[in-house]
Amino acid sequence: MKLAINGFGRIGRNVFKIAFERGIDIVAINDLTDPKTLAHLLKYDSTFGVYNKKVESRDGAIVVDGREIKIIAERDPKNLPWAKLGIDVVIESTGVFSSATSDKGGYLDHVNHAGAKKVILTVPAKDEIKTIVLGVNDHDINSDLKAVSNASCTTNCLAPLAKVLHESFGIEQGLMTTVHAYTNDQRILDLPHSDLRRARAAALSIIPTSTGAAKAVGLVLPELKGKLNGTSMRVPVPTGSIVDLTVQLKKKDVTKEEINSVLRKASETPELKGILGYTEDPIVSSDIKGNSHSSIVDGLETMVLENGFAKILSWYDNEFGYSTRVVDLAQKLVK
C-alpha cells in the first residue's frame, strides 16, 4: 500500500509513526509547514516523548531511519500529485476538508482530481459519506468505497461499548459525557473563538462544549439512531479521555456483575480484541497514554440502579488509539 498524509498535525504524526512501524510505504506528506519544522515535531513530542527513530530534513523531504518521504506544500487538494505517485490511500487529517466539495476544496478532490484511489477522513464528514467504526460496522467495508470517515475519537470509544450493551441487554436511551483532553481547536490563552467557551484558556478551566459523538453512533449502529445524545467537558490534560455513558436498559434486573462480565468477554472476542479493552485496575488518564485500544472499560466504575438504569465508564487515548484505527482502516480498505 502506498500512503499519503494530508495534514501533519497531532493525528497525522501519530498515523505516520504507527504506519511506519508496520512497514507501510508512506510516500508523501502534504503540509504547508517547512520540512525542518515537520521533522522536529515528528521527533520531539511533548505528550509521547522523543521518537525512537533517526529523523532528518532536507530540501523537499524528511528522512526517517534512512527512508525519504516527500514533502509537498499545496493548499488545494485538486493539485496534489497523487496519481503520479501511485497513492492508494490518502489520510485527510487537516481537519479542513470535511465536505466532499467546496470553494476551498473538498475531500473527494483527492480521488476525483488528484488521482488517489481512496481517502479516509479523520473527522466526521459534514455530508453523506460512509462512516466506519472498526469493531462495529466493519462489514460495510467494500472495494467500491472511495471515501470513508473514521468518525471521531469519541465515537470510536462509545460505539463498541454501546454495541455490546445493546446486543446483550438492549439500550432504550442514553446520555454520554466525554471528559476529554484539550485539543488544537481551543485557545491556550483567552482569545476569540466561534465557541465562546473554547475561547477560554484550555489549561486553566473545565470547559463544557458540544460533541456529535453520541448522535453519530446512529451512523454505525442504525438501531440506536436517535437514542443517544451527549456533551463534552474539555479538561487540562494533553491526551487521555474518558466516556461516561448512562443508559436505560431493556433488561430491568441487570446487575453490575453481569454488565462487567459481558464487556470483559466481548473484549476477548476476535471481533473486538484490540479495540475494546477491559480493566479493573484503579487507573487514571495518564495510564492509558499510548494505549492503542479504541475503548477501555473501567470495571471498577460500573454502577447499576433499579429498573435497568446503568452507568459505564470507558477510557481512550484520543490521539494514539484513534490514529491506530485510522491505519487499521487504511489497511482494510486496500485488502
From Swiss-Prot:
The keyword Oxidoreductase appears for this protein: yes
GO biological process: glucose metabolic process; glycolytic process
Assembly description: Homotetramer.
Similarity comment: Belongs to the glyceraldehyde-3-phosphate dehydrogenase family.
Taxonomic path: Bacteria, Pseudomonadati, Spirochaetota, Spirochaetia, Spirochaetales
Keywords recorded for this protein, A-Z: Cytoplasm, Glycolysis, NAD, Nucleotide-binding, Oxidoreductase
Enzyme Commission number(s) of this protein: 1.2.1.12
Residues holding D-glyceraldehyde 3-phosphate: S152, C153, T154, T183, R198, T211, G212, R234
Catalyzed reaction equations: D-glyceraldehyde 3-phosphate + phosphate + NAD(+) = (2R)-3-phospho-glyceroyl phosphate + NADH + H(+)
Biological role: Catalyzes the oxidative phosphorylation of glyceraldehyde 3-phosphate (G3P) to 1,3-bisphosphoglycerate (BPG) using the cofactor NAD. The first reaction step involves the formation of a hemiacetal intermediate between G3P and a cysteine residue, and this hemiacetal intermediate is then oxidized to a thioester, with concomitant reduction of NAD to NADH. The reduced NADH is then exchanged with the second NAD, and the thioester is attacked by a nucleophilic inorganic phosphate to produce BPG.
Residues annotated as site: Activates thiol group during catalysis: H180
SUPFAM superfamilies xrefs: Glyceraldehyde-3-phosphate dehydrogenase-like, C-terminal domain (SSF55347), NAD(P)-binding Rossmann-fold domains (SSF51735)
Residue positions binding NAD(+): R10, I11, D31, R75, T122, N184, N318
Name the record gives this protein: Glyceraldehyde-3-phosphate dehydrogenase
UniProt GO molecular function: glyceraldehyde-3-phosphate dehydrogenase (NAD+) (phosphorylating) activity; NAD binding; NADP binding
Pathway annotation: Carbohydrate degradation; glycolysis; pyruvate from D-glyceraldehyde 3-phosphate: step 1/5
The organism of origin for this protein: Borreliella burgdorferi (strain ATCC 35210 / DSM 4680 / CIP 102532 / B31) (Borrelia burgdorferi)
Top-rank lineage group of the source organism: Bacteria
GO CC annotations, alphabetized: cytosol
